[in-house]
From Swiss-Prot:
Stated family: Belongs to the MscS (TC 1.A.23) family.
UniProt gene name: MSL5
Biased composition (Basic and acidic residues): 1-12, 48-59, 169-179
Region (Disordered): 1-248, 861-881
Record protein name field: Mechanosensitive ion channel protein 5
Organism: Arabidopsis thaliana
UniProt keyword terms in alphabetical order: Ion channel, Ion transport, Membrane, Phosphoprotein, Transmembrane, Transmembrane helix, Transport
Length: 881
């Protein structure tokens, strides 16, 4: 290993990429150093005061600077080797000069000289000593610093470490010279943890380059229209490449999933069937064979033991038959199938266990009667009976608890989120449909072509004329086009996507007829799906293409809106009209889609900015709804665990009462302990109960809602059982206990209807009435022209008068939105203020303070009315001595 000169005072920044454990990047600069090693702290030794021959100059410089020196371990051991090898030193100096001038030169002579000097074969390149390219570096500070390290420069530094050393020493010294410093990543991790869920990822560096724009919107394939939900995933290879996985859609025609229809023959069910056959056979033999009829065991007939074993082993099998009969009866009733079947399948295991234990208890009670207890003279039978009763009571209580929790959770989600889920899925359907080909127009064209082909065919039959071969080929092509499978499935009832839902079925749903199965499926679509463009619904697409179509940020939403606008509008058109929507949607869907845009119902057109705002708003709504459902699901699970603890305590108390353990003295001790627990945890239990009532009964907000509490506007960030996290206007997180929020008035902007606003300005009292009338007319015409912003005909009133000098005029107008998006509100308000100011300048309406008449009646007397000794302070320096 080559010795290191003390004049090598280069500054190193060594950065480690957290994603690649073995990646190290280093940079350095030096003008007169020869060493190129990367050191770590354990490879430094303090200089002992002796001066080498080759570092005299560097020592003088360090003494002048008052600094101390470092020497790498093993330096003295290899100093003679370096002195005996002057070409190596010259080559090193040459390489450093080239590096300082900005050139990078790779010399293979270094490797050859190292081989000749060490007389060892060259070390093969491995994962540990081969430099890596493309390293992402992180400096000591929390901000990331990107440094490019050229592989050949690192290779030269590594090769110089092998000069003059043996193979063993070479490996050891290379292990010593690896890393200088490792930057801490804790600040960056802490920032990632505190990031808001409602904020978007950073905007790409080059916003003009969009991966969705680079992909063609006219990808070939069969379009699956009318489906909403998760994007299809790439499946197994088929005849035409990768085909999507076909999953059953069990929710289209009925409300029962296919997985519950299929009978599952497990290993235990198979054993139960074998046991049933064997035990029934032995029971028949014991009842028919004379020798076995008199056989007893513990003074009990053999057939009674066989019946007991039959109930214990095969009781679950018999109880499953009873459950199947109950389910069959429920399925036959339409109302029960909509409302009850979900809960029946949810608790079928608990019902099966209850029936099984009930059969066991009946068999035990009637077979092991009082006579057997007297003959055996044992009290164990009594305790066995009590234990069976305890288990049966526990299962019944647990069954009731499960049913209540499922019913309450389903009714809560259905009454609170069904309308929002339905609207969000329809918005997703509109976005996906408008981003694809005009299917309705294509369908109409194919129907016309099909009709023409049929007319020509019928005419040929009636007239008896023969068509030319070219015309026959054209007619056949028309008939083939008319049978396109992708278009015939627009109104079909059956699909292939198990996680999707058809738009016609979605429109028929409401809070009265939606089943619990469908409600659960809709929630899963929101939680697991994402808004995307139409490209993902084509066949023969890869996972990369599907990811490129998903909308995961507001920037991607704006790109999707731009793509939709160019796809829907005619060439050269600046607006989207209802006729453009009719090329993609049916008439009912097109009218409903037009009503989603602000001001489109009055102006009958949609601008590009209006479309962009709508897509961004749809993305925000979808993200907030997904976060709300996720937090609500988490809260329900935690509430379920709390109820499990409470029910467990109740079951234990009931067990003690049934087993007779709870005597009077025991109850007295237990009551005293309960009083102590109530004194300690009573306030906490009260807080938890109030928080549960606030979250599930009152439920004044959801994630993403803008609220006003104590005069401060806050945005809901996260909802928990005990607390709610808010974001203030400056993104400061504020945590409120739910029990405290239950006692405060909460204003919810999101749930409010279209809200009003007021703009006030003052004019002088002497302003002519003609100008005031003119400014009123200008304001009214401006607001009426902005139909997508405000409702027409705002109120303009004289609000107040200030000391007979000015009159305050107020403009009361109503936005076509609520104040959930406060930034958009102030943007529109600013536009109106600019218009008011522009109008005032054009009409020469200014607020000028007219001169006031001041009458001076008397002045205070002075000692010398003609002169005064007072002078300004600045004149003091100008006076002479």
């Amino acid at each position: 290993m080559a010795a290191v000169d003390s004049t090598d005072r280069r500054d190193f920044i060594v950065n480690i990429n957290g994603q690649e454990s073995g990646a190290v990047g280093a940079t350095g600069s030096s003008s007169n150093a020869e060493g190129g090693n990367i050191w770590k702290e354990s490879s430094y030794d303090f200089w002992d005061g002796e001066k080498g021959k080759n570092d005299k100059k560097g020592d003088d410089e360090d003494e002048d600077g008052g600094s101390f020196h470092f020497r790498q371990r093993g330096e003295r051991r290899h100093s003679s080797a370096e002195l005996s090898d002057p070409p190596s030193k010259l080559i090193g100096q040459f390489l450093h000069k080239q590096r300082a001038s900005g050139d990078e030169i790779s010399l293979d002579v270094e490797l050859n000289m190292a081989e000749l000097q060490s007389n060892t074969p060259p070390r093969p390149a491995t994962a540990s000593n081969t430099p890596r390219r493309g390293l992402t570096t992180i400096s000591e500070s929390s901000s990331p610093v990107k440094t490019k390290v050229k592989a050949d420069a690192v290779r030269r530094r590594q090769n110089r470490t092998s000069l003059g050393g043996s193979s063993d020493e070479e490996g050891r010294n290379r292990d010593e010279a690896e890393v200088l410093k490792c930057g801490s990543k804790k600040p960056m991790l802490s920032r990632n943890k505190t990031k808001s869920r409602l904020q978007d990822p950073p905007t790409p560096t080059h916003p003009a380059i969009d991966k969705t724009e680079m992909k063609s919107g006219r990808r070939s394939g069969i379009f699956k229209s009318g489906f909403l939900g998760k994007s299809p995933k790439a499946g197994t290879p088929g005849r035409n490449g990768f085909e999507e996985e076909e999953e059953e859609d069990p929710f289209l025609d009925e409300d029962l999933p296919e997985e519950f229809k299929r009978d599952k023959l497990s290993f235990w069910v198979f054993l139960e069937w074998i046991s049933l056959v064997l035990i029934v056979t032995s029971l028949v033999c014991s009842l028919t064979i004379h020798n076995l009829q008199r056989k007893t065991w513990w003074k009990l007939d053999l057939w009674k033991w066989e019946v007991t074993v039959l109930v214990l082993i095969c009781g679950r099998l018999v109880s499953s038959w009873i459950v199947r009969i109950i389910v069959f009866l429920v399925e036959k009733n339409f109302t029960w199938r909509k409302r009850v079947l979900y809960f029946v399948y949810g608790v079928r295991k608990s019902v099966q266990n209850c029936l099984w234990l009930g059969l066991v208890l009946l068999a035990w009670h009637f077979l092991f009667d009082k006579k057997v207890e007297r003959e055996t003279r044992s009290t164990a039978l009594r305790y066995v009976t009590r234990v069976l009763v305890c288990l049966l009571v526990a299962l019944i209580i647990w069954l009731v608890k499960t049913i209540l929790v499922k019913v309450l959770a389903s009714s809560f989600h259905m009454s609170t989120y069904f309308d929002r889920i339905q609207e969000s899925l329809f918005t997703q359907y509109v976005i996906e449909t408008l981003s694809g080909p005009p299917l309705m127009e294509i369908q109409r064209m194919e129907e016309e072509e099909q009709q023409v082909a049929e007319d020509v065919k019928s005419l040929e039959k009636l007239a008896g004329a023969k068509l030319p071969p070219a015309l026959k080929a054209t007619v056949k092509s028309f008939m083939k086009v008319g049978k396109s499978p992708g278009l015939n499935r627009i109104g079909s009832k059956r699909g292939e996507d198990g996680e999707g839902i058809r738009i016609d079925q979605l429109k028929r749903m409401n809070t009265k007829n939606v089943s619990a199965w469908n409600m659960k499926r809709l929630m899963n679509i929101i939680l697991k799906g994402a808004i995307s463009t139409l490209d993902q619904n084509m066949q023969d697409t890869t996972q990369e293409d599907e990811d490129a179509t998903h909308i995961r940020s507001e920037y991607e939403a704006k790109c999707a809106a731009r793509k939709i606008f160019h796809n829907v509008t005619e060439p050269g058109s600046r607006y989207i009209y209802l006729e453009d929507f009719l090329r993609f949607l049916c008439e009912e869907e097109a009218e409903r889609a037009m009503a989603l845009f602000e001001g489109a119902s009055e102006s009958d057109k949609i601008s590009k900015s209006c479309l962009k705002n709508w897509v961004v708003k749809a993305f925000r709504e979808r993200r907030a709804l997904a976060l709300t459902l996720n937090d609500t699901k988490t809260a329900v699970d935690r509430l379920h665990r709390i109820i499990n603890v409470v029910i467990g305590i109740i079951i234990i108390i009931i067990w003690l009462l049934i087993l007779g353990i709870a005597t009077t003295r025991f109850l007295l001790v237990l009551s005293s302990q309960l009083l102590l627990v109530a004194f300690v945890f009573g306030n906490s239990c009260k807080t938890i109960f109030e928080a549960i009532i606030f979250l599930f009964v009152m439920h004044p907000f959801d994630v993403g809602d803008r609220c006003e509490i104590d005069g401060v506007q806050l945005v809901v960030e996260e909802m928990n059982i005990l607390t709610t996290v808010f974001l203030r206007y400056d993104n400061q997180k504020i945590i409120y206990p739910n029990s405290v929020l239950g006692t405060k008035p909460i204003a919810n902007y999101y749930r409010s209807p279209d809200m009003g606003d007021a703009v006030e300005f003052c004019v002088h009292i002497a302003t002519p009435p003609e100008k005031i009338t003119a400014i009123k007319q200008r304001i009214l015409s401006y607001v009426d022209n902005k139909k997508d912003y405000w409702y027409p005909a705002p109120m303009i009133v004289f609000l107040s008068m200030d000391d007979l000098n000015s009159v305050k005029i107020a403009v009361w107008l109503t936005h076509r939105m609520n104040h959930q998006d406060m930034g958009e509100r102030y943007i529109r308000r600013g536009l109106l203020l600019e218009e008011v100011g522009k109008t005032c300048r054009e009409l020469d309406i200014e607020y000028r303070l007219y001169p006031l008449n001041i009458n001076v009646r008397s002045l205070p007397p002075t000692a010398n009315p003609t002169s005064s000794d007072r002078i300004p302070p600045s004149w003091m320096q100008q006076r002479g001595p």
